[in-house]
A protein has these predicted regions:
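Conserved N-terminal entry element of GNAT/NAT acetyltransferase domains
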Residues: 1-8, 138-140
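Conserved beta-strand-loop-alpha-helix junction that forms the acyl-donor binding cleft
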Residues: 77-80, 105-115, 131-138
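Conserved GNAT-fold acetyl-CoA-binding loop/helix
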Residues: 8, 14-41
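Conserved beta-strand in the GNAT
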Residues: 54-62, 67-74
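Conserved acetyl-CoA-binding loop of GNAT-fold acetyltransferases
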Residues: 119-129
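Short hydrophobic/aromatic beta-strand element in the GNAT-like acyltransferase core
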Residues: 45-48, 58, 72, 105, ...
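Conserved acetyl-CoA-binding loop-helix of GNAT-fold acetyltransferases
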Residues: 75, 81-94, 116-120
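A short helix-loop-beta-strand connector motif used in the catalytic cores of GNAT acetyltransferases and
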Residues: 38-48, 55, 69
Length: 140
């Protein structure tokens, strides 16, 4: 279940994103930028994914120009493959739909295994900006 993250959760969430994205960043010649993460945190809607009383993931939504973007969706390594990312994604879509918005957008590395997850949940490719692709899910 998603719950609003507090300021004290920022370091934990940042470490999760940094660790989960380390291989992709290395592959694409990028460096982790803690200042960028802090700025994104400050400008976004931050949620923890909780299961069995503990934090097992992190999700951030960003609203820009009247649209909502899924900026981060991370699950701790030992809890992947259990449907937690799917649950978080469906809850994020419900949040955005509840605001009356018609779509949720995101960017993801084109070579990320997450692309399959997003496609299974109705996201289609809108643009290709290597190494990223932009995707959108229309919300009924």
């Amino acid at each position: 279940m998603l719950e609003v993250a507090s300021a004290r959760d920022r370091d934990w969430a940042g470490a999760l994103v940094r660790d989960n994205m380390a291989e992709a960043y290395r592959r694409h010649g990028l460096a982790w930028d803690p200042a960028r993460f802090a700025a994104d945190w400050a400008g976004g809607e931050n949620y923890l994914l909780r299961c069995d009383g503990g934090a097992v993931g992190y999700l951030r939504l960003l609203r820009h120009a009247g649209r909502s973007y899924l900026q981060d969706l991370q699950v701790v390594a030992e809890r992947r493959g259990l449907g937690l990312g799917t649950q978080a994604l469906e809850q994020a879509k419900a949040l955005v739909r509840g605001r009356g918005e018609a779509a949720l957008r995101l960017k993801v590395f084109a070579d990320s295994p997450a692309v399959r997850l997003y496609r299974r949940h109705g996201f289609v490719e809108l643009l290709n900006e290597p190494p990223l692709i932009g995707m959108e899910c229309r919300l009924p």
